[in-house]
UniProtKB/Swiss-Prot annotation:
It holds the Pfam family TACO1_YebC_N. This is Probable transcriptional regulatory protein BT_2363. It comes from Bartonella tribocorum (strain CIP 105476 / IBS 506). The lineage of its organism: Bacteria, Pseudomonadati, Pseudomonadota, Alphaproteobacteria, Hyphomicrobiales. GO terms for molecular function: DNA binding. Its main location: cytoplasm. InterPro entries: Integrase-like_N, TACO1_YebC-like_2nd/3rd_dom, TACO1_YebC_N, Transcrip_reg_TACO1-like, Transcrip_reg_TACO1-like_dom3, YebC-like. Belongs to the TACO1 family. It is found in: Cytoplasm. One of its GO terms (biological process) is regulation of DNA-templated transcription. Keywords: Cytoplasm, DNA-binding, Transcription, Transcription regulation.
Amino acid sequence: MAGHSQFKNIMHRKGRQDAVRSKIFSKLAREITVAAKQGAPDPAMNPRLRLAVQNAKAQSMPKDNIERAIKKASGTDVENYDEVRYEGYGPGGVAVIVEALTDNRNRTASNVRAAFTKSGGALGETGSVSFMFNRIGEIIYKPEAGTADHIMDAAIEAGAEDVQSEESGHHITCAFEDIGEVSKTLESKLGEAESIKTIWKATTLAPIDEEKALSVLRLISTLEEDDDVQNVYANFDVSDEILAKLSV
C-alpha cells in the first residue's frame, strides 16, 4: 500500500484527538491568512483563499476561526510567512517532500534538517526528489457521499481525471490548476468534501520493510508536529501486513 495517508490515520488513532485537531486548525488558519494577505480577502475573488476556506470547512473548522484567520491578514501585526519546500531522503531511500509556511527560514530549515538526520536520512537540494512526484489536485469524499458509480459520474462531469472508491472513501484527482473549479462543481453535486488540497503524488515508489516503515513513520510524525510544516509527502510502499501491525 503506497503513500503516507495510511500512516497519518495510524498517528491520529494513537495520538490525542484534541491535540491533533488543534494542530490541524492552526495550520489551516495559517494557510487562510497567507492566502488572504496575498490576494483579496473575499474567497469569491481569491482562488487560493477559496480553496483554503473550502478545505477548512471540510475539516470542520469553526466559522469563527475561519473569519478570524481572514481578518488577521489585514492587521498591522500579521507575520510575513514565506512558502518553502524542502526535499530529502528518509530511511530506506524513501523520498520526502516537506512544505512549510514560515516566518523564520533559518529556524524551519534547522528543524527539518535535524528531523532528517535523526531518522538516518538526509536533507537534499530543491529538486532532488520532486521529479519522482506529480503535483495534482485531490478531493476526498466520505463513503456515504454516494455509490462508486454516482461519484464517478459526478467527477467526470466536473472535469476530474481519476476516481478511486474504497472503504475509507472516494479519492478524486484532477490537474493541479483545475482543483478550484473541479471542487466547486463537485460541491454542487455531492456537497462539501472531507478534504480538498493540492498534493505531491509519487510516481516512483520505494518498497520498505517493517523496521524502515517505523523509522519513516517517526520522521513524518516529527515533521508534521512542527508548527511551520504544512504538508509532508513520501513515496514509500509498504505491505498491508506491516500496515496492520503498525495500526495496532
